[in-house]
């Protein structure tokens, strides 16, 4: 029989070996100690606890549970070790099951672990029970327990309960502070988050780097540039702007506050840049529509040896969407496939967006159908993509599939759905979605939905109803809704109403160039040339200048940009010859220049030249020169395509046997054999 001193020495040696084996994950060494303990009948609580810790750290939770269940007696550490093992392995339900059957006393460590587990599984009821137990046992004020309870309430969406706990926190608690801000931001309660920030400004010296990240996240979400700059100044004093997490948060804040240059400056000072900081600065550029710069940063990132993650790919793909750079998007898709990121939800959603906005809706559908899982963004992207391509029936079918899949529609879903209804003139269906289905789903209609309804009534030819709809809803001051009605007045030749609507728009926005253009067009179509002259005079008096039309087209890997009347391009001689050739060809099949869209007070011959050099025609000629016969031409434009270009491009598609896709600010125009997918209504 071993002496008491010898037994203690053996136990100490066993504990040392188990600790070392757990740290190195040496399963065989720890297992051997367990076997020796069984043979020597060493079964005190301390040795059992070390065995539980060893098995848990080696990922053998089944064996850890066997040791726990075989213990003749336990202390709080026993339960906490097993619960922590479950929690660390993501088995939060098992941790909570252990808590329910607990026959050991609960201390602050056990309770904080249990509450954290309820947060992970979003079990609000169980979390409240744990909180109640903490209150009864006098442990609710312990920092570990208090912080875990705050985090649990925020994670479960019960921020009001978290506020009650936070208000009873004594002194400054950085973790509690951070949890509250992030909880409010997750729920979109920005007013509440700013009140928390202001209450803690006096404790800024005690903020940790997580506090700075949380506050900067608030500033980014609310575009609080002044506060964000002040927080930046405090970070500079403590040299925290060099911390990669704080630095990345600064980049994100400046980007969302429309300060791309400041975002880049915050990025440049970082001594160590990781994929998070690279992605943050790319996002800042993309949010500020600096798409080419964002794609260049992606190339720089790869040159620096930083491996892009799924979010980096998503940002780069969204930049391609902004440029409608289909070839670059395809290259990124292939790269994501090679690096194993292609199936990620964020990447697939970005691919759907990129293909939709690049005029390749069939590829968008292919990605959507191949996704292993989808979220509401996936469904919204394909619905809106179909709607913008004039595929209204397909959009409505996808919406039906969305309901069958039990995915809850969002505010954005109904914008796409109502846009689809508008293209088909389905008034009754649109009113049903707006007044009944959205109400049943708890979604309050916004101005985007009401504007879609205006377009829907207009498409059905019910212009007077559309006017009354605008006047009877809170969109009566919304220029977009009135312009939708104005465009329909032009299509339906209701020039009397159109004149009244134009006056309404110009009262709201006297500098709206598009309204002057449409008003001039209506006067010209009605042979009211005195009205055209009047519009031109009014524009001169008010100093209103037509925004230059800009169109771009991708040829090879390069995006070529053209402005209206652009005669300085290196290919302008070839482009001019091609344009004259095309105009001669389409005149044979019925093209007549529409001088009504020309606001210049010049002779007809000069007006025809102005029309010929519209940016989309220049881009089209360039595309025809530099693409093989039969290839699809894709053109993007910064303004609504004018009536003359729309007619001309339809006829060019006929005489060249080309499929031509034009994306303007309203929709996609898929033109083939002289017919446009918009049915001449846009």
What residues fall within each predicted segment?
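Terminal (and in a subset, N-terminal) low-complexity or junction segments at the ends
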Residues: 1-682
């Amino acid at each position: 029989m071993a002496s008491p001193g010898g037994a203690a020495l053996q136990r100490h040696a066993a504990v040392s070996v188990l600790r070392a084996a757990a740290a190195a994950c040496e399963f065989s060494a720890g297992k051997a100690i367990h076997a020796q303990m069984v043979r020597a009948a060493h079964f005190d609580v301390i040795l059992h606890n070390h065995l539980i810790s060893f098995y848990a750290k080696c990922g053998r939770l089944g064996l850890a549970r066997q040791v726990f269940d075989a213990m003749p007696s336990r202390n709080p550490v026993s339960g906490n070790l097993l619960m922590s093992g479950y929690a660390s392995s993501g088995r939060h339900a098992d941790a909570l099951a252990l808590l329910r059957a607990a026959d050991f006393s609960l201390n602050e460590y056990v309770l904080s672990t249990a509450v954290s587990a309820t947060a992970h599984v979003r079990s609000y009821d169980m979390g409240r029970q744990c909180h109640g137990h903490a209150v009864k046992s006098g442990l609710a004020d312990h920092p570990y327990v208090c912080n875990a309870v705050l985090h649990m309430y925020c994670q479960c969406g019960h921020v009001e309960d978290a506020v009650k706990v936070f208000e009873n926190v004594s002194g400054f608690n950085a973790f509690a502070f951070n949890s509250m801000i992030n909880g409010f931001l997750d729920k979109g309660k920005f007013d509440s988050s700013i009140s928390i920030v202001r209450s803690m400004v006096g404790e800024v010296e005690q903020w940790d780097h997580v506090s700075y990240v949380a506050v900067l996240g608030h500033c980014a979400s609310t575009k609080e540039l002044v506060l964000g700059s002040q927080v930046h100044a405090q970070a500079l004093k403590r040299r925290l702007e060099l911390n990669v997490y704080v630095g990345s948060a600064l980049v994100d804040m400046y980007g969302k506050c429309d300060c791309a240059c400041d975002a880049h400056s915050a990025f440049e000072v970082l001594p160590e840049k990781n994929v998070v900081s690279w992605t943050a600065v790319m996002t800042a550029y993309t949010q500020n529509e600096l798409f080419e710069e964002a794609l260049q940063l992606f190339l720089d990132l790869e040159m620096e040896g930083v491996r892009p993650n799924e979010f980096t790919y998503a940002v780069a793909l969204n930049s391609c969407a902004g440029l409608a750079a289909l070839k670059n998007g395809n290259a990124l898709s292939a790269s994501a496939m090679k690096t194993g990121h292609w199936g990620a939800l964020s990447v697939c959603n970005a691919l759907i967006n990129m293909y939709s906005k690049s005029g390749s809706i069939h590829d968008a559908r292919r990605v959507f159908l191949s996704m292993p899982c989808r979220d509401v963004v996936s469904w919204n992207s394909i619905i809106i993509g179909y709607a913008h391509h004039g595929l209204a029936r397909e959009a409505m079918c996808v919406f039906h599939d969305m309901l069958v899949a039990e995915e809850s529609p969002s505010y954005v879903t109904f914008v796409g759905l109502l846009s689809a209804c508008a293209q088909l003139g389905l008034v009754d269906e649109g009113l049903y979605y707006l007044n009944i289905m959205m109400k049943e789903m708890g979604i309050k209609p916004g101005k985007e939905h009401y504007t879609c309804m205006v377009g829907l009534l207009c498409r059905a030819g019910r212009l007077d109803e559309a006017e009354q709809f605008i006047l009877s809803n809170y969109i009566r001051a919304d220029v977009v809704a009135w312009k939708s009605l104005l465009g329909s007045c032009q299509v339906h030749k209701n020039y009397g109403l159109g004149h009244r609507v134009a006056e309404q728009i110009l009262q709201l926005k006297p500098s709206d160039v598009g309204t002057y253009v449409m008003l001039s067009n209506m006067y010209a179509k009605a042979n009211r040339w005195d009205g055209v002259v009047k519009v031109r005079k009014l524009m001169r008096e008010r100093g209103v200048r037509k925004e230059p039309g800009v169109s771009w087209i991708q040829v090879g890997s390069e995006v070529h940009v053209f402005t209206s009347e652009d005669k300085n391009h290196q290919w302008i001689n070839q482009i001019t010859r091609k344009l004259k050739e095309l105009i001669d060809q389409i005149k044979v099949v019925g093209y007549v220049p529409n001088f009504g869209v020309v606001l210049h007070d010049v002779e007809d011959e000069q007006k025809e030249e102005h029309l010929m050099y519209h940016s989309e025609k220049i881009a089209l000629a360039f595309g025809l020169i530099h693409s093989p016969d039969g290839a699809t031409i894709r053109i993007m434009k910064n303004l609504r395509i004018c009536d003359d270009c729309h007619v001309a491009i339809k006829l060019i598609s006929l005489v060249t046997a080309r499929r031509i896709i034009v994306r303007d600010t309203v929709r996609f125009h898929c033109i083939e054999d002289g017919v446009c997918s918009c049915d001449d209504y846009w």
